[in-house]
A protein has these predicted regions:
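Short secondary-structure transition hinges
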Residues: 107-112, 123-153
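N-terminal intrinsically disordered/low-complexity leader segments
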Residues: 1-31, 216-221
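Helix-turn-helix
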Residues: 35, 43-77
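Solvent-exposed, amphipathic alpha-helical segments
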Residues: 39-47, 89, 93-100, 181-189
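Hydrophobic alpha-helical connector segments
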Residues: 81, 95-122, 178
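Generic hydrophobic, amphipathic alpha-helix propensity
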Residues: 32-40, 57, 78, 82-90
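Hydrophobic/aromatic-rich alpha-helical bundle segments in the mid-to-C-terminal region
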Residues: 129-133, 141, 161-208, 219-221
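An amphipathic alpha-helix signature
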Residues: 37, 107, 111, 115, ...
Length: 221
């Protein structure tokens, strides 16, 4: 599971440089790159990462293979960029929800974040095949930290800024454990039901609600 704060509380982008060989400078080039990413996302759901190739991505996107290599060195780089796009979309959607809704505390915010994760898993092409990159590479978001550690850092930033928690190493550990546990349970929910077993999703929320209060109470500012 990947939990991130609103854009206002973001603790920074993933530290790994963009996998793009170069940034598109014209609107037409930017649209072409977006078509490549859309094609990659669709194909991931249809055929999986192992069968994915730059040739198939080019064919689906309706671009020349040379155009693909102009921006990406290989299929992993394209997949990495799809993952980054998913992260940014997730941040934006959670941020919009936080602006529109009032929460009594961090526990309701966590429920909302889980709800956004579940909705993206159901509706966003490529998301169910990648999650946040762990299916392809545990270090897809950052070469030095595994993907869930990166996402836990985002949630930590939210707790520090929005809910008055004191910074500490223990807080880092508590949030990372919550993210790893929630991730495992949500994956179980989608293994049992392609749309996500609602009972298991509810259990994931209860699990985090039960664990974090005991861990976070010593760190309240």
């Amino acid at each position: 599971m990947s939990l991130v704060p609103t854009p206002q509380t973001d603790t920074g982008d993933c530290s790994e440089p963009t996998p793009l060989r170069r940034q598109p400078t014209q609107r037409r080039s930017a649209r072409r790159v977006e078509r490549m990413l859309d094609a990659c996302a669709d194909l991931l759901d249809e055929i999986g990462y192992e069968a994915l190739s730059t040739t198939r991505i080019a064919d689906r996107a309706g671009v020349a293979i040379g155009s693909v290599y102009q921006f990406f060195p290989d299929k992993r780089a394209i997949t990495q960029e799809v993952t980054r796009r998913n992260v940014e979309q997730f941040v934006s959607r959670v941020g919009a929800r936080f602006l529109e809704e009032d929460y009594r505390g961090w526990w309701e915010a966590v429920d909302a974040i889980i709800d956004e994760y579940v909705d993206m898993h159901r509706t966003v092409p490529g998301f169910k095949s990648l999650h946040f990159g762990d299916v392809v590479d545990l270090n897809l978001l950052d070469s030095d930290s595994d993907n869930n550690t990166v996402i836990a850092g985002r949630l930590r930033g939210l707790l520090l800024k929005e809910y008055g928690l004191a910074d500490s190493h223990e807080l880092d550990v508590a949030v990372l454990v919550a993210v790893e546990a929630g991730d495992a349970v949500l994956k179980l929910a989608f293994r049992r039901d392609p749309d996500g077993d609602t009972e298991i999703i509810s259990a994931a929320k209860q699990l985090i609600r039960g664990f974090l209060p005991r861990q976070l109470s010593p760190f309240r500012g």
